[in-house]
Each structure stands twice: as structure tokens, then as C-alpha cells.
A protein has these predicted regions:
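An alpha-beta-alpha
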Residues: 99-143
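Short, surface-exposed alpha-helical segments at coil->helix boundaries
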Residues: 3-7, 34, 93, 97, ...
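Short helix-capping segments at alpha-helix termini
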Residues: 12-16, 67-68, 140-147, 194-200
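Hydrophobic alpha-helical segments within soluble ligand-binding/sensing domains
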Residues: 87-114, 162, 212, 228
Length: 228
């Protein structure tokens, strides 16, 4: 968990009179991200450790940080053209490529695949998600070019709406037996599959959230990709 790591580092730095403040935002809400950016700029810290979830807003922030000569480091996903001082996390594009490889392992024919994405408030998709999807689609185009990819939007915090969305989707596309989600919400799909006694869907997700791990142990998720 990133927060635990930052907390531990903050304790170690206390003797050096270094104060670490954590600013949280909703990764599914661009407005929340913008508010956190404004807080950073107002406080004008000596350095910034940032998860650049929304690319365009991150570009705006880093431009201001450079003007103020404030160094910044990225975690979870990278925006290489912004030349952060450092980056800690998995290679998002390569992880998407790997996800496709695992999902289609031993597959001899082209098949329909579902990509489950979370609705986000704002005009931007997650930078990390976009990179993962690009890597995923690259593998598909390289080895299974006739595969049909279906995108399904679900809600991060609304089970009732998700149940209807997923029911309608699987009823309309009964041929789909493989799916992937590029965020930490794979357990939402796994919960639906469990509740509806569906056990023939191969699902891949990201991040070692407890709910994801439980679904993995129950074989409702086949693989979890994580950097920690």
C-alpha cells in the first residue's frame, strides 16, 4: 500500500525536520484531482510525489512546478515526456501487453473480449488506464487481429447500476468468455459473476486489493497484475 510506505518514510524523515503531507483525491473524479493540484500549488512544497491519473491536468501542474523549481516524482503511472525526476511503478503499456498475453494464453482462435472500464467524472480518461489499454490492444493486433473488443462502462461505487449493466451486456453478448479490467475494480465483475453463478468467464484484473485477492482465491479472477 502506497500510503503505508509514505507513512513509514515520513516517520524516518522526522529527525531531519522533513514534513510529509499527503493529499488525497478520488481517482474517478477529475474535479477532485484538480482540487488536489490547487492545494499543491498553494502550499508550494519543496518536492511533489504524484500519481498522474489525469494527463492534461498533470501537464498543467508540472508546468507550474517547473516555474517554481519544485522537483516532482511520479508513482503508479508515468508520463515520459514530462521528464519527472524519477518514476516508481510498473510499465503500464507492457503490463497491458502482458494482460492480453495471459488472457489469450492457449487460445487458438480469435474470440470476443470485454474490457470493463469505470466511469470517471470529467473529460479525461486515466493516464494509466489508457497506457494499459494501448498495450493490451497492441498484443491483440499482433497475434489475434480478428478479435472483437467490447468496451463496457461500469460504476466504481454503484452495485445496483452495475448489475443491470452487466446483465444486459452478457445477455446481449453470450459468446464472451474473456474479460479484463485495467483498474482495481475487478472484484466488482467477480462479485457479479459469483452472484449469478457464472463460472465460465476468464477475468484478469489489477492491484492486490483484499476483495480482488479473495476473488482470485475463489477462481473468479484468473490473474491479478500488481507492482507491489
Amino acid at each position: 500500500d502506497i500510503k503505508i510506505g509514505v507513512d513509514n518514510a515520513a516517520k524516518e524523515l522526522l529527525d531531519l525536520n522533513i514534513n510529509v503531507q499527503q493529499i488525497f483525491f478520488d481517482q474517478y473524479n477529475e474535479t477532485s484531482f484538480i482540487q488536489s493540484i490547487n492545494t499543491i500549488l498553494i502550499q508550494s512544497p519543496d518536492g511533489v510525489l504524484l500519481a498522474p491519473v489525469f494527463k492534461e491536468q498533470t501537464i498543467i501542474l508540472t508546468k507550474e512546478l517547473r516555474i517554481k523549481n519544485i522537483p516532482f516524482v511520479f508513482i503508479d503511472s508515468d508520463i515520459s515526456e514530462l521528464n519527472a525526476l524519477s518514476y516508481f511503478g510498473m510499465h503500464s503499456f507492457k503490463s497491458g501487453y502482458l494482460a492480453a498475453k495471459l488472457l489469450l494464453k492457449d487460445e487458438k482462435n480469435n474470440s470476443d473480449i470485454a474490457i470493463f472500464q469505470a466511469y470517471r467524472t470529467g473529460n479525461s480518461e486515466s493516464n494509466q488506464t489508457e497506457l494499459r489499454i494501448n498495450g493490451f490492444k497492441k498484443y491483440i493486433s499482433d497475434y489475434y487481429p480478428d478479435t472483437v473488443i467490447h468496451s463496457v462502462k461500469i460504476y466504481a461505487h454503484d452495485t445496483d447500476k452495475n448489475d443491470k449493466i452487466l446483465k444486459d451486456f452478457f445477455n446481449h453478448y453470450p459468446q464472451i468468455k474473456k474479460g479484463v479490467t485495467f483498474n482495481s475494480r475487478a472484484y466488482l465483475i467477480a462479485d457479479y459473476l459469483t452472484t449469478n453463478y457464472i463460472d465460465d468467464i476468464k477475468l484478469i484484473g489489477y492491484d492486490l486489493l483484499e476483495k480482488n485477492v479473495i476473488a482470485l482465491k475463489k477462481n473468479k479472477i484468473c490473474y491479478l497484475l500488481a507492482q507491489r
